[in-house]
Design a protein with these regions (language model features):
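Conserved cytochrome P450 K-helix E-x-x-R motif and the immediately C-terminal K′/meander segment
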Residues: 1-7, 306-376
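N-terminal membrane-proximal hinge/A-helix region immediately C-terminal to the signal-anchor transmembrane segment
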Residues: 1-80
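Cytochrome P450 heme-thiolate monooxygenase catalytic core
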Residues: 99-279
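Conserved cytochrome P450 K-helix/beta-meander segment immediately N-terminal to the heme-binding cysteine loop
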Residues: 382, 388-418
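Classical protein tyrosine phosphatase
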Residues: 275-298
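C-terminal helix/juxtamembrane-tail motif
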Residues: 478-495
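Hydrophobic, well-ordered secondary-structure elements that form the walls
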Residues: 341, 383, 406, 433, ...
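Cytochrome P450 heme-binding "Cys pocket" and the immediately downstream C-terminal segment
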Residues: 292, 423, 440-478
Length: 495
């Protein structure tokens, strides 16, 4: 099933649900908003995705069925991740992220190596190397924008959650993570894993990632037991509480090494794969529209700005002040731009196994929207599979008018107090019900912090030509990657 075939079958059926038979199984594809909400409302004894999750962990991460067989340990790990939904974690994580970005935003690109007197010059940051930064004599910089952004953002977020020693000891961690992401759909197809170059790179990268995450786990577990993990790991005192707790869960439940390292790789990938890419696509859409760029900069100016007292970071670059609360509450346009980016960029399928027969009924408004005379009810039998066709719904002109157009205002409406407010409406990129994304609240603040800070600190233009063009989307991992990276010229707005 892909977006093209799903769109064709949706349009041909005219219904809120249509079905496929693949082998011995029957798959019911949901493509109407009111039906999606009913799916989210079902309990786990009616609809769940446990078998799908077990299959994915076995196929994508080679967990050798440990997710299936070590039930207590696996669910203990997921319960520990629930901390990411709690206000204390969100405030801690976003506060630490904002503090880092206030200093690091000006360091998206640093300074040319030849400006330093030592013979070997100043080494590039890892994200600069990934973005193949070129330092121009006129004070501007050139870089591959996608690789620069996803690795810059990944460095800060990984350091904040897992501590700085992880990447310090495994400097190729992000390169491996993005190689895995590029080829994960080849791995899932199985026979492509060893045939295609992307598949082979992904398998090799996955192996290195599991080694890195197990070494990190062993070091933290050793520290928690009151022993010295070794000088290369340092104090390990900058690790977030949620990751500290997960190590304790693995120890308490006597989880196997395979379960620990494969699930830790899945969390590392999951934390980065959507947010980092969305910041890239969001920045590309905004920088390529001068009026939108101007409006967003004006909107965020009171809440994200250069330090009024001229503070500078330890490297001498200008420091930002970021008011997270003001950014979230009083900047509807940039938040709507984030939602619109997800609508156009994230194309995934939500899977639910049907444990008991379930009846789903179209709403009258949705039936009218789809041109039907009356709502239809569907009985979905136990033993079948429900598929939520998020990607095709997000590009359905009946649900989102002019879906090919980047139009953030579609998510802005007037609130009860007359002020504009942003609502996701029929956008379900964070899932819902039992399977709502655990990192949703942090992810939204994280994306706005990174995007707003870079919009304030940097001008971005094409290396060739007058207008920045948004690249075409390919497929990789959970969110789309560009088919080709885009080479840009960056200029720091404040020195």
């Amino acid at each position: 099933m892909n977006d093209t075939s799903l769109t064709a079958h949706r349009d041909n059926s005219g219904d809120g649900i249509f079905s496929y038979r693949i082998g011995s199984g029957k798959y019911y594809v949901v493509n109407m908003p009111s039906l999606v909400q009913q799916v989210f409302a079902q309990r786990g004894n009616v609809l769940n995705k446990q078998r799908t999750l077990e299959w994915f962990m076995k196929t994508a991460f080679d967990d050798k069925f440990s997710t299936r067989d070590e039930h207590e340990a696996f669910h203990g790990h997921h319960n520990a991740l629930n901390l990411m939904l709690k206000e204390d974690f969100i405030n801690e994580a976003t506060g630490k992220t904002a503090c880092a970005v206030e200093v690091e935003a000006a360091k998206l690109v640093t300074e040319a190596p030849w400006l330093y007197p030592d013979a070997e010059g100043k080494p590039m940051e890892l994200w600069e190397e990934a973005g193949q930064v070129r330092f121009n004599h006129d004070g501007t910089f050139e870089a591959n924008f996608y690789d620069l952004i996803v690795n810059y953002m990944g460095q800060i977020v990984i350091d904040m959650l897992w501590g700085k020693a992880l990447i310090k000891n495994h400097p190729n961690l992000q390169a491996d993570m993005w190689h895995f992401d590029e080829g994960v759909h080849h791995i899932i197809t199985k026979f492509l894993a060893n045939i295609t170059a992307a598949g082979r790179r992904a398998v090799a990268a996955r192996e290195r990632l599991t080694i890195a995450m197990h070494e990190w786990h062993e070091a933290v577990a050793t520290k928690q037991a009151g022993r010295d993990p070794g000088a290369q790991w340092g104090a390990l005192d900058d690790i977030s509480q949620v990751m500290q707790d997960r190590v304790k869960v693995w120890i308490a439940t006597k989880a196997s090494e395979t379960l620990q390292k494969t699930n830790d790789v899945s969390v590392l990938w999951g934390v980065n794969v959507n947010s980092n890419k969305n910041v890239f696509w969001m920045l590309m859409q905004i920088y390529s529209r001068s009026h939108l760029l101007s409006d967003i900069r004006e909107e965020i100016a009171p809440y994200v700005h250069i330090s009024p007292c001229g503070e500078r970071g330890p490297d001498g670059f200008p420091k930002l002040n970021i008011n997270i609360d003001g950014l979230m509450k009083h900047c509807p346009l940039i938040k709507a731009a984030f939602y619109e980016t997800m609508r156009m960029n994230m194309s995934g399928l939500g899977i639910r196994e049907v444990i008991k027969d379930v009846v789903l009924k179209e709403s009258a408004s949705d039936a009218e929207l789809f041109g039907k005379k009356r709502p239809q009810a569907y009985t979905i039998p136990a033993g079948s599979t429900l598929v939520l066709a998020n990607g095709t719904m997000q590009m359905d002109q009946r649900i989102f008018a002019n879906p090919e157009q980047f139009y953030p205002e579609r998510f802005i409406e007037e609130g009860p107090d007359g002020a504009p407010r942003v609502t996701m409406k029929n956008l379900h990129t964070f899932g819902g019900g039992l399977y709502k994304c655990k990192g949703r609240y942090f992810a939204e603040k994280e994306v706005l912090i990174f995007a707003s800070s870079l919009l304030v600190m940097w001008d971005v233009a094409p290396v060739n030509g007058e207008e920045l063009e948004v690249p075409k989307m390919g497929y990789a991992g959970a969110s789309r990657s560009p088919l080709e990276d885009v080479r840009v010229r960056l200029t720091r707005r404040y020195n």
